Swiss-Prot record:
GO terms for molecular function: DNA binding. This is Chromosome segregation in meiosis protein 3. It comes from the Eukaryota. Coiled coil: none annotated. Residues 21-33, 165-174 have a biased composition (Basic and acidic residues). Residues 21-46, 155-177, 191-230 are annotated as: Disordered. Residues 155-164 have a biased composition (Polar residues). Belongs to the CSM3 family. The gene is CSM3. GO terms for biological process: DNA repair; DNA replication checkpoint signaling; meiotic cell cycle; replication fork arrest; replication fork processing. Forms a fork protection complex (FPC) with TOF1 and which is required for chromosome segregation during meiosis and DNA damage repair. FPC coordinates leading and lagging strand synthesis and moves with the replication fork. FPC stabilizes replication forks in a configuration that is recognized by replication checkpoint sensors. GO terms for cellular component: replication fork protection complex. The keyword Cell cycle applies. Component of the fork protection complex (FPC) consisting of TOF1 and CSM3.
Amino acid sequence: MAEDTAFDDLFNYDAGIEELLRDPEEEKNDRRASGTGTGSTENKNDDLIGLEEIKITRKRAPPVKLDENRLLSQAGIPKLRRSAKTKLKFKGKRHEFSDVARLLNFYQLWLDDLYPRAKFADGLSIIEKLGHTKRMQVMRKEWIDEGKPGRNLYDSNVTYLDPNSDNRGDKDTADPTIPSIFQRTLEQSAPAMEAHRNDQAESTHSPKRLSDSEIPIFGGGKAISLRNNADDDDDLFVPGNEGMDIDPPVQASQVPEEDDLDTFLAEQESTMQNTAHGLGILKPNAPPADEEDDLDALLAEAENTPARAPKTGHLEANRPAADDFDDELHILNEFGL
């Protein structure tokens, strides 16, 4: 039986000719009508289950813009500042052209990494426009202040401890960005700073107390300080005499007026005259010109007057000429002649 079927197939030349001669459009229409396609079957199955076909579409990434946020990011100016400290080195004098070329190449590489879509000249123009904004001006001022001397000891974003605050000794409230050695130094120096500030306040509001060595022994007058009252810090630069008292300048209210000054001088002059008279060392003033006649008459009378007899009982009637000369000289000395 099987042999007969194989023999018949050998002589059956017309098998499959109709399928080859059939129009492909008709075949597609037949398949659509019968529903034998795989896609239609799957759609029917999805409709029966209640599921809809989910189409996945990939959204295009938004274009990167060169704005303030990108310029201030870690890949922007902060990276430029960090790299310039290590990678950018100049040779100096007689190498100006090569130094400028190296600087431009450094900027070009940085800008290409930051914003590769723009050319170097276009990127520089964009950055120049962004530099006029308020935010960039504030950041530029902060960067300039960080580069000044004396600002490298601490970070710019570190909040320092206030000696007057109540939580200066609390380690939990301290800024974690401060290194431990700086934190320990600030904690140790806070009491000393507060004590120094209190001493300055007391010396300003309370009067200066004089010691026994500063009080004058004769009473009255101003106390003379035996110690220089200048600040001790100034002695490091301006050596001063510690035996001198640096007093404030005399104010206008302390200067005596002219009338008081004249009265004081008159009192001093009268006191000096009385003292000189008491000691017998002050000579009388010269007689005025109108008393010269009286003086001449007195001298003539003294010359004509006979000498008195001595009490010892001598028999001489007149004094010798030497005694008369001495008397005249004594009188002249008394009148200041």
